[in-house]
């Protein structure tokens, strides 16, 4: 996607959504303003910078935040019942002493070009928050659970809480619903969708380094229990089984796969075209060996996918190794 929008654009942590024949992606901007750029496309090949969600310092104050903090992983959704766009985003204030101090907000607009509502505070329960608009009008917010105690997995589980648009606040406290589809650990970037009576949860696992991957689970009830896809991970740069739940190293260079051009593949979201085609956008990197320096930083790739007869999402070639072309 960087090649499509221009190399001077930072396109990562992509959340992709469709309204009619229009495709939109929203991305992280960290400590930079204007915040949360939105790109637009008609064919998912040619993209242009369309608008920014956050343009006013009164909406979000990033002045004193250090590098790489600020706005993380916005989740762009469109609610058909309300004809409204929603963006859920987190502001990471600090990561000192392994304590992730994040505040999560939601912002709403009739037109994706704005004007956008004032941010509504959701919670500070964990980063990478996202929202599902259910068929019955209820709204669910999922995020990861960050554990600070020694000896506990960090992140630990995916949690969910209901959001009331009438009260403009969450209802109750987040509850754990999913502990991942692999043992790679570092579960994050949850996205809930609904299809054919199933709730699907898509997550990143393995950390943002070389053991990164995309996993899925599903359940008939939004609260679970969720069953993992039997072929998890569904997209990765390093196929195979590994146990890394207690490893604090997110980079994990030992998992570098020389057979793959795209490394660190994970943190994805999918979109379906009006004709039923399915595409997944995900994080990746292209390091130079042997130093494994990623001079272009984290990038975004796109994979063609398909739904199986059993109702699971697969890469179009039935593999799970992320492809460059």
Where would I find each of the regions flagged by the language model?
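Carbohydrate-active catalytic/glycan-binding domains of CAZyme proteins
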Residues: 1-325
């Amino acid at each position: 996607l960087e090649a499509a929008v221009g190399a001077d654009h930072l396109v990562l942590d992509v959340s992709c959504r469709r309204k009619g024949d229009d495709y939109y992606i929203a991305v992280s901007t960290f400590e930079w303003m204007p915040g949360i750029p939105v790109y637009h496309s008609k064919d998912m090949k040619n993209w242009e910078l369309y608008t920014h969600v956050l343009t006013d310092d009164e909406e979000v104050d990033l002045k004193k935040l250090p590098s790489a903090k600020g706005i993380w992983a916005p989740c762009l959704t469109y609610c058909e019942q309300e004809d409204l766009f929603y963006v859920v985003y987190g502001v990471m204030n600090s990561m000192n002493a392994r304590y992730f101090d994040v505040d999560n907000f939601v912002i709403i607009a009739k037109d994706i070009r704005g004007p956008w509502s004032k941010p509504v505070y959701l919670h500070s329960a964990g980063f990478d928050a996202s929202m599902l608009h259910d068929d019955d009008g209820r709204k669910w917010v999922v995020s990861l659970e960050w554990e600070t105690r020694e000896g506990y997995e960090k992140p630990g589980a995916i949690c969910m809480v209901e959001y009331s648009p009438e009260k403009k606040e969450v209802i109750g406290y987040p509850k754990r619903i999913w502990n991942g589809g692999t043992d790679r650990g570092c579960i994050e970037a949850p996205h809930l969708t609904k299809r054919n009576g199933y709730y699907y949860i898509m997550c990143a696992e393995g950390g943002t380094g070389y053991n990164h991957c995309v996993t899925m689970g599903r359940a008939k009830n939004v609260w679970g229990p969720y069953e993992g896809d039997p072929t998890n991970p569904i997209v990765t740069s390093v196929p195979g089984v590994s146990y890394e739940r207690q490893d604090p190293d997110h980079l994990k260079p030992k998992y570098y796969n020389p057979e793959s051009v795209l490394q660190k593949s994970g943190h994805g979201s999918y979109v379906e075209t009006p004709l039923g085609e399915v595409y997944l956008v995900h994080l990746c990197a292209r390091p130079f060996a042997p130093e494994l320096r990623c001079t272009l930083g984290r990038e975004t790739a796109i994979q063609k996918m398909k739904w199986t007869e059993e109702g699971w999402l697969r890469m179009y070639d039935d593999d799970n190794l992320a492809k460059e072309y």
